[in-house]
């Protein structure tokens, strides 16, 4: 039996990420792409508006054996239905993986713009570690940032500390390197890179 192949394509038109956004699932039938489902924020409550990101990730967020789509502060189930919306607003970068050894499921590390504006529906932290299953915050830093520093455009997560079983993360807030498990500040010195990392042996 031929293996089914899946592909994700992202097209950002103008600056629509700050208002309405859509995600489509398409099947290749013969030589045609046929829509399977469409998630359009116009068909959902206003809390979904402006919750997407400059990138998305595909992973089994809820542990059901099927991949979901993570798009900023919003997660869409494999069938196109709502999984969760954390209410934390728009961000630039997302990382998904197993960052806390003894915690079930996957975790997300993400940074956000204008996080203070979303304290009412989110939690106001500019960089967060999030439970991928339900969008709840595990830990975070960068709350109550001054206006000129409120756009936290980058963060990174990596296993830097050999004495800890869990990963560490840091961001462009330049506040330090923190543990993903919520135990707090690990170090005030950390690598200068805040975009992507490569793990190797």
Residue ranges and their predicted role:
Residues 15-17, 75, 100, 112-114, ...:
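Residue-level signature of beta-propeller blades and closely related beta-rich strand-turn architectures
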């Amino acid at each position: 039996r031929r293996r089914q192949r899946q592909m994700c394509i992202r097209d950002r038109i103008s600056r629509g990420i700050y208002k309405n956004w859509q995600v489509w699932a398409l099947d290749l039938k013969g030589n045609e792409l046929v829509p399977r489902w469409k998630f359009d924020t116009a068909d959902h409550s206003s809390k979904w508006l402006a919750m997407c990101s400059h990138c998305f990730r595909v992973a089994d967020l809820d542990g059901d054996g099927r991949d979901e789509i993570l798009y900023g502060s919003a997660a869409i189930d494999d069938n196109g239905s709502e999984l969760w919306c954390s209410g934390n607003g728009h961000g630039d970068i997302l990382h998904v993986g197993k960052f806390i050894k003894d915690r079930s499921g996957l975790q997300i590390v993400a940074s956000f713009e204008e996080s203070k504006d979303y304290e009412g529906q989110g939690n106001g932290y500019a960089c967060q570690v999030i439970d991928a299953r339900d969008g709840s915050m595990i830990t975070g830093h960068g709350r109550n940032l001054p206006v000129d520093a409120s756009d936290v455009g980058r963060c990174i997560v990596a296993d830097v500390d050999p004495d800890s079983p869990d990963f560490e993360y840091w961001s462009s807030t330049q506040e330090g390197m923190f543990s993903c498990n919520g135990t707090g500040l690990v170090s005030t010195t950390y690598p200068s890179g805040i975009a992507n990392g490569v793990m190797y042996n």
